[in-house]
Amino acid sequence: RRLLFVIFYVVVFTFFSFAQNAIVTENANAGNPISEWGVPDFRDNRIAGFANKMSLSRGETVRFKINVQSGANYTLRIYRIGYYGGNGARLMANLGTLSGTVQPSGISDPSTGSLDCGNWSESATWAIPGSAVSGLYIAKIERSGGGSNHIAFIVRNDASNSDLYLQFPDATWQAYNGYGGNSMYD
């Protein structure tokens, strides 16, 4: 009897521990190999883009602005970064093949070397499901005929709280962003 009680307690405790932690549950899913979601060269400017916001809450819509060389078609797939059995990411949405747009030149500031592409038009959107698990997401954009890149963004769950705080280095990502010909380190 005692052994049955201990086994029952362990099973119930394990179930509720995993059930109450959506991130642990999500990361236990099978993932996609890096050969599917990775990009060989993040400085490949044949296709490049950004999200309208770096951080969005579940239920919001992320808006992408994407420049595609020669206006070629492209695919857009959304992945969540996580453990996933060592695969590193899991496909969350496939927006399919989209028509590419050659965007106007960004507004440059020669004194700082910065380039502002806020004048680009919206290329695609993704409505973040209300059930999405918080974390780092990437949109892999892949141009027909070659070229791929990532657009990183964070999905939050504003209804939850945690003892753990994780800050993503988006300022560092921007500093190393070489789009337009140079980064902060060139």
Across the structure, where does each feature detected by a protein language model lie?
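Short beta-strand segments of immunoglobulin-like
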Residues: A51-L56
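Structural beta-strand segments of beta-rich domains
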Residues: E60-F64
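Bacterial N-terminal signal peptides
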Residues: V6-F15
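Aromatic-Pro/Gly-enriched surface loop or interdomain linker
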Residues: G71-I81, A89-G96, G145-D186
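Positively charged n-region of N-terminal signal peptides that target proteins for export
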Residues: R1-R2
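Proline/serine/threonine-rich low-complexity linkers at boundaries of modular beta-sandwich domains
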Residues: Q20-R46
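Extended acidic/polar, glycine-enriched regions
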Residues: N73-Y74, Y84-G86, T101, I107-D109, ...
